[in-house]
Amino acid sequence: ADKLLYALRDVTATVDSIPLIASSIMSKKLASGADSIVLDVKVGSGAFMKNVDSARCLAKTMVELGRLAKKPTIATLTNMEQPLGCAIGNAIEVIEAIETLKGHGPKDFTELCIDFTTEILMVAGIEKDEKVARSMVEDAIHSGKGVEKFREMISWQGGNPNVIDDYTLFAQANEIIDLD
């Protein structure tokens, strides 16, 4: 249905309509059954929302929709004026996420993940104190609990959890073009 609505927004020149963008995003979040919602609104040249004002408006609209649905919801703005992390492409971005869970990720991506997960713990009511929540996240990375939870999540979804230990199990590109 979302694809059809996006096509309709395209032909009616309402692709940039913040209320329609917000309702599209939040309808999926609410339909998933989440108890609380933490949103990462990207802003800048590498994002759909090109300026801070429109990103802030989108964030506020989505938070209000969450409030109306009686779901604790917060939104953060992330600067996308430059790439985040070092990887570009589905498989290698997942590998970068796994490396981050193992404590070996790029500094900028690791910091964003820690900040974001700290917010999740607080919004979900797991921990009220930000310093304690952050410490819990850092401990999950350093102890290996985070990557083990990801391994469980892969299994729950019918995936092969061995990809965490053997990156060659990821699908490889059908064609590689040398640009030299």
Regions found by a protein language model. Give the residues of each.
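Well-ordered secondary-structure scaffolds
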Residues: T12-S24, K28-A31, D35-D180
